[in-house]
């Protein structure tokens, strides 16, 4: 199943969720305020925490996640999704970082490839799940 998101951060999170394995992804920290708890109490709390955090992978390949970004919550969205208007929005938003033209081209090529991957899945009748939040970029991406 292809997972569709509208930000790089969400893409990374869903990629991890597709292949989640609790045994391989242990980690974290526990702190306490006040008196040091007894070992038995700590053991009980850690066991409860593990149970509470137990999860299961979404399944599938982490390659089956696309980000349809294009900064659609900013500027005029009446033009082509990766046209000059979108590039101008990108330049306005990120100009302080002095991206080289090749880096900008790479970003838009990757975005175009992800859009084409979505279209291919749709044309082949494959399953697609769209993850939407109430964030403006997400709503605009869905539209």
Residue ranges, per PLM feature:
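Long, hydrophobic/aromatic-enriched structural stretches that serve as scaffold segments
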Residues: 95-142
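A structured, charge-rich N-terminal accessory region that forms the first stable segment of a protein
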Residues: 1-101
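Short, conserved acidic/polar surface loops in the N-terminal third of protein domains
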Residues: 77-80, 139-143
């Amino acid at each position: 199943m292809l997972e569709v998101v509208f930000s790089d951060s969400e893409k990374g999170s869903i990629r991890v969720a597709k292949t989640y394995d609790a045994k391989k992804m242990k980690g974290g920290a526990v702190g306490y305020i006040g008196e040091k708890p007894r070992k038995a109490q700590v053991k009980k709390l850690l066991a409860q925490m593990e149970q509470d955090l137990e999860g299961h992978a979404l399944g599938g390949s982490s390659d089956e996640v696309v980000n349809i970004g294009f900064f659609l919550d900013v500027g005029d969205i009446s033009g082509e999704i990766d046209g000059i208007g979108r590039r101008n929005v990108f330049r306005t938003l990120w100009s302080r970082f002095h991206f080289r033209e090749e880096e900008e081209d790479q970003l838009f090529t990757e975005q175009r490839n992800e859009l084409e991957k979505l279209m291919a899945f749709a044309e082949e009748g494959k399953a697609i799940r769209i993850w939407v939040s109430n964030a403006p970029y997400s709503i605009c991406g869905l539209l």
